Curated annotation (Swiss-Prot):
Any single Pfam family the record assigns to this protein: H2TH
Keyword Magnesium belongs to the record: no
Binding site for DNA: H91, R110, K150
Cofactor note as given: Binds 1 zinc ion per subunit.
InterPro entries attached to this UniProt entry: DNA_glyclase/AP_lyase_DNA-bd, DNA_glyclase_Znf_dom_DNA_BS, Formamido-pyr_DNA_Glyclase, FPG_cat, MutM-like_N-ter, Ribosomal_uS13-like_H2TH, Znf_DNA_glyclase/AP_lyase, Znf_FPG/IleRS
Species in which this protein is naturally found: Vesicomyosocius okutanii subsp. Calyptogena okutanii (strain HA)
Lineage, top ranks: Bacteria, Pseudomonadati, Pseudomonadota, Gammaproteobacteria, Candidatus Pseudothioglobaceae
Name of this protein: Formamidopyrimidine-DNA glycosylase
Keywords for the protein's UniProt record, in alphabetical order: DNA damage, DNA repair, DNA-binding, Glycosidase, Hydrolase, Lyase, Metal-binding, Multifunctional enzyme, Zinc, Zinc-finger
Length: 269
């Protein structure tokens, strides 16, 4: 699933390609993804200028004077910018054709994504989101404060989008490894000092992933079609039975909260 680094990568790519461009027409090649795509987009967005492109958690926000297009890539979605005359590919379900002769196309094979619209930029899906991990609201002490009396494991805790957004499974595994924290520990049992270390590790891992263009395991590609290169920097995720580069111990894989967890039993205590 595309997480914060992947959406940030797409946001930056789109900003350089489609900002200040006018929409020729919005085309719904399918009526729905996870939810129904608003039919009025085909008329509402015609001749509208793309003013800014933002990100909130895993949501891409494309802003116009008349409102905000809210896009979520679901489990397998991707966005590309191509020449408008490029043949439509299978699973490309939504398209913004621009007056400069290019098109922004959303591909979503599993159809767990979403294309929504808000006149004022607000939406119930955005209202419950936690803090952004790369902003000052994610400060030393924040995770410690939120974790008091929490019985859930630390990995599930930092993946909770109501606490902090965008720390997906890959980045949770990598951050906990860098911080030397066992993913099985209860969130409420970890000291403030260790949480402060983890906070910095989350920031560092996400920043590195963004600089590498995200992580491609299966479906994710950047807007230019290139894969994300953070895959080459993974220390534990996908490294079952390989040697830990720090201690030469063996990386372990187990299922935790219905997700694969990778960690070094020796390094992470």
């Amino acid at each position: 699933m595309p997480e914060l680094p992947e959406i940030e990568t797409i946001k930056r790519g789109l900003t350089s390609l489609i900002i200040n461009q006018k929409v020729n027409k919005a085309i719904l090649h399918r009526e729905n993804l996870r939810w129904v795509i608003p039919k009025h987009l085909s008329t509402t967005l015609t001749n509208q200028l793309i003013s800014t492109i933002d990100r909130r958690g895993k949501y891409l926000l494309i802003k116009f004077k008349v409102g905000t297009l809210i896009i979520h890539l679901g489990m397998s979605g991707s966005i590309k910018v191509v020449n408008t005359n490029t043949p439509l590919l299978k699973h490309e379900h939504f398209e913004l054709q621009l007056k400069n002769g290019t098109s922004m196309r959303l591909k979503d094979p599993r159809r767990f994504g979403a294309v929504l619209f808000s006149k004022d930029g607000s939406h119930k899906l955005l209202d419950s989101l936690g803090v952004e991990p790369l902003k000052t609201s994610f400060y030393d002490g924040y995770l410690y404060q939120k974790s008091r009396n929490k019985q859930q494991n630390i990995k599930a805790f930092i993946m909770d989008n109501k606490i902090v957004v965008g720390v997906g499974n890959i980045y949770a595994c990598e951050s906990l490894f860098m911080a030397g924290i066992n993913p099985k520990l209860k969130a409420g049992s970890i000291s403030k000092t260790r949480y402060n270390v983890l906070t910095q590790c989350i920031k560092n891992i996400l920043t590195q992933a963004i600089e590498a263009g995200g992580t491609t395991l299966q479906d994710f590609v950047q807007v230019n079609g290139n894969p994300g290169y953070f895959t080459q920097n993974l220390s534990v995720y996908g490294c079952k039975n390989k040697k830990c580069y720090r201690c030469k111990g063996i990386i372990i894989k187990f299922v935790q909260n219905q997700r694969s967890t990778f960690y070094c039993k020796k390094c992470q205590t």
